């Protein structure tokens, strides 16, 4: 089945890399073919959950497409481990749509859920949603980490200022300017300067 769809790509123009895990070889072959026809690069195939995890860790794909019912380790357990390791978003496939399975898949960290039988028109939107959700979560986590880092830096600078005020007799603006100037002169971050002040002056107190 030929397609004129543009290949799904990352922001830098690289084709999306996918690992497919499905214990039934014929179905796995169909999924791989379906993905390749719409432009995904299938970089690894697995027949059980443990193999899927190993491939994901080794290949670091953009996406993992995985059946729920598999030997050795089921897809939901494998998805949970892949999600916890923050390797890639996982899309789970299943022949069942019970509420309990959907909830387990969600709790495991799966980004999307597709019920068999499906066509590329069902699968591709789920993959794109999973990639989009994963990117949003990663951006949010990065923003939170950045905010936390800024808050910690501010606290360290405040503590360093207090030490400079008490040990060098500087005013608060002078102490801040001293940290700022030292940071620029020595090509260090203000956090690094503050940590040095706390370590060197603080240890003498």
Where are these regions (language model features)?
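C-terminal output/effector regions of signal-responsive regulators
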Residues: 134-136, 142-205
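C-terminal output helix
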Residues: 100, 118-127
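Active-site residues of response regulator receiver
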Residues: 67, 94
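Two-component/phosphorelay signaling modules centered on CheY-like receiver
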Residues: 24-44
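Short amphipathic alpha-helix used as the core "switch/output" element in two-component signaling
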Residues: 54, 76-87
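Acidic catalytic/metal-coordinating carboxylates
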Residues: 48-51, 72-77
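Receiver (REC) domain active-site loop signature in two-component systems and cognate sites
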Residues: 61, 70
């Amino acid at each position: 089945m030929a397609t004129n769809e543009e290949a799904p790509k990352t922001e830098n123009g690289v084709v999306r890399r996918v690992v497919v895990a499905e214990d039934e070889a014929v179905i796995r072959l169909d999924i791989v073919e379906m993905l390749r026809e719409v432009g995904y690069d299938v970089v690894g195939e697995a027949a059980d959950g443990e193999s899927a995890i190993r491939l994901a860790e080794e290949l670091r794909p953009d996406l993992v497409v995985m059946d729920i019912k598999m030997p050795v380790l089921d897809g939901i357990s494998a998805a949970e481990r892949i999600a916890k390791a923050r390797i890639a978003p996982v899309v789970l496939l299943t022949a069942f749509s019970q509420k309990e399975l959907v909830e387990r898949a969600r709790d495991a960290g799966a980004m999307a859920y597709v019920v068999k039988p499906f066509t590329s028109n069902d699968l591709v939107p789920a993959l794109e949603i999973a990639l989009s959700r994963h990117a949003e979560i990663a951006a949010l986590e990065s923003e939170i980490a950045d905010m936390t880092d800024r808050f910690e830096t501010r606290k360290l600078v405040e503590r360093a200022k207090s030490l400079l005020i008490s040990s060098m007799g500087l005013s608060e603006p002078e102490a801040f300017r001293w940290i700022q100037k030292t940071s620029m002169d020595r090509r260090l971050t203000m956090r690094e300067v503050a940590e040095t002040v706390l370590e060197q002056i603080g240890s003498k107190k």
